[in-house]
Amino acid sequence: MVVISIANQKGGVGKTTIALNLSFTLAEKGYDTLVIDLDPQFNLSFGILGMKLLDYADKNIGILLSKNSVKKKEIEESIIKINDKLDLIPSHLQLSAVEKMLVNAYAREMKLKNIINQIKENYDYIIIDNAPSLGLFLINSLVASDYIIIPCEPSYFSIAGVQLMLDTVEEIKESNLNPKLKVLGFIFNKYSKQSKIPQKRLEQLKQLYPNIPVIGVIPRTITVEKAEREGKPVFKFDANNPASVAFSELAEWVIENVK
């Protein structure tokens, strides 16, 4: 079982899109996959569940994290089966309030790890979607993860924000909260050949961090935007779309390189 965080402290880089598509694609390839929505904006949960998200006010990741101790049965009751191979623990409207409550909680950085440890034998992959900020939720996610994937896009501020994320990873490792945490690689999102800027930014990223691979380049397409609006993976719209192919290749890379 492998836990992977999709994280970047810069917003708008496509974390949720990548988390959703990677999770669905791994499941489509036959792997038991759980996606955890740890973002208070709950875009992933709302995209998949729509207004049904309101039905899970007492069964979501916020409720689990707010408890001093949580039983395996409570965790299992909060898991929503999306299909035969994909499960979801949703976010909710009140998740921001839970993060504030955690400030004074005992072993606050270990909350998510303790939850995952009770159910990890049920899955091949657990994917965590994170908020674009450094807070207790992101720290929990990094402490609970084996790997982190850092999405970025072809903008100066996105590339500059990568270093903030890498610094946070080093702090987590050096503090011994999770000394084995590894950066799996970058995903370059919203790539377009119609302008020289995306190509230039991609080369800058490779030059700045030669020891961290770019494990996926996701093209900017209208199909991705349509899929986002309906909370579906891109391959459900068009399996031959360049973005569908890119996400399939990303999943294959993860399967081959993460054990």
UniProtKB/Swiss-Prot annotation:
Key words, A-Z: Plasmid
Domain of life of the source: Archaea
Family: Belongs to the ParA family.
Protein name according to UniProt: Uncharacterized protein MJECL24
CDD domains: ParAB_family (cd02042)
Organism the protein comes from: Methanocaldococcus jannaschii (strain ATCC 43067 / DSM 2661 / JAL-1 / JCM 10045 / NBRC 100440) (Methanococcus jannaschii)
